[in-house]
């Protein structure tokens, strides 16, 4: 392969990785702009371009680098088209699963772990910035909530379909570019953890890292996601624990791990026993805001198969 072509493709790999992570985590925002058909075309073109860059950069996919358990699950998902009662929808879902899985393989092979995390962070930073910009634009210049672009001419837009609710200056909850507060909060949490890990490890760029931490915390506050709040407490506790045990000896680590597992099991037991009190503190109902109803409906649908 031409060395010049290979080196250029190598330089484009991080951009390809950012595009994949962006579409994977913020695809709803792209879909809100271009609609389902436009989103499908954009995703297909981006995925094709990324694979071309992947091969031109000299990367190769070998069977030994593909997880047997994951690939078996993907095959099972695709085979479910055979016995599904909704074959068209299941076939579309199978195609999406294959596309998503191929993108994951591309990213996993193309980058070492540290570089992959940096590429991931770049994509999540774009999502966070776009979310703030979009929320500000709607609150300052539009003055009312907006639906996805392809729904602008609908006579009636369902309540849950609105993209931005113009709630930034009312304290939230905001939905950002992704159009859903829970995924947006999850993105902010992942970015926060990555920034903290790199900040602790590298100990540089203090002002920049502090700004990103503030941006992520702002998203977490404005989204008000109870699920992500719990995940944040668990993640930060795990991060602090790992930072502590890295300075301990072998036997001290074993003891610390046992203490941590015991504490985690105790907290979990208390949370289960005092479920009503815990959900009340989080400002949610005992079935976590209708999730019991959702699962009941899903079980009804599963009975049709």
Model-derived features with residue positions:
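Transmembrane alpha-helical segments and their membrane-water interfaces
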Residues: 85-139
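Structural signal for the C-terminal ends of transmembrane alpha-helices
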Residues: 47-60, 106-116, 194-203, 237-248
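Transmembrane signal-anchor hairpin modules in multi-pass inner-membrane enzymes, especially those
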Residues: 1-79, 115
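A membrane-periplasm/extracellular boundary helix in multi-pass inner-membrane enzymes
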Residues: 133, 137-142, 240-286
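TM-adjacent membrane-interface loops and short helices in multi-pass inner/ER membrane proteins
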Residues: 292-305
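Membrane-interfacial entry segments at the cytosolic side of transmembrane helices
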Residues: 114-123, 204-210, 247-262
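Membrane-embedded alpha-helical segments of multi-pass membrane proteins
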Residues: 37-53, 94-103, 183-191, 230-237
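Alpha-helical transmembrane segments of multi-pass inner-membrane proteins
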Residues: 121-224, 228-243
């Amino acid at each position: 392969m031409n060395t010049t072509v290979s080196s250029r493709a190598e330089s484009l790999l991080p951009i390809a990785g950012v595009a994949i992570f962006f579409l994977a985590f913020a695809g709803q925002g792209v879909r809100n702009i271009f609609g389902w058909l436009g989103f499908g075309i954009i995703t297909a073109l981006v995925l094709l371009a990324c694979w071309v860059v992947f091969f031109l950069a000299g990367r190769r996919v070998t069977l030994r680098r593909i997880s047997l358990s994951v690939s078996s699950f993907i095959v099972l998902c695709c085979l479910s088209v055979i016995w599904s009662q909704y074959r068209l929808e299941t076939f579309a879902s199978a195609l999406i699963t294959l596309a998503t899985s191929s993108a994951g393989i591309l990213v996993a092979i193309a980058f070492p772990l540290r570089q992959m995390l940096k590429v991931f962070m770049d994509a999540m930073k774009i999502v966070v910035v776009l979310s703030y910009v979009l929320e500000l634009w709607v609150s300052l210049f539009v003055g009312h909530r907006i639906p996805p672009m392809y729904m602008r001419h609908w006579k009636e837009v369902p309540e849950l379909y609105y993209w931005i609710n113009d709630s930034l200056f009312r304290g939230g909850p905001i939905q950002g570019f992704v159009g859903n507060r829970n995924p947006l909060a999850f993105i902010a949490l992942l970015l926060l953890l990555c920034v903290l890990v790199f900040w602790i490890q590298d100990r540089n760029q203090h002002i920049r890292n502090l700004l990103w931490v503030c941006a992520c915390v702002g998203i977490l506050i404005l989204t008000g996601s109870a699920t992500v709040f719990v995940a944040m407490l668990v993640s930060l506790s795990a991060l602090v624990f790992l930072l502590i045990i890295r300075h301990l000896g072998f036997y001290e680590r074993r003891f610390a791990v046992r203490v941590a597992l015991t504490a985690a099991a105790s907290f979990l037991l208390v949370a289960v026993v005092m479920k009503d009190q815990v959900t009340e503190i989080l400002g949610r109902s005992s079935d976590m805001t209708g999730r019991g109803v959702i699962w009941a409906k899903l079980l009804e649908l599963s009975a049709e198969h």
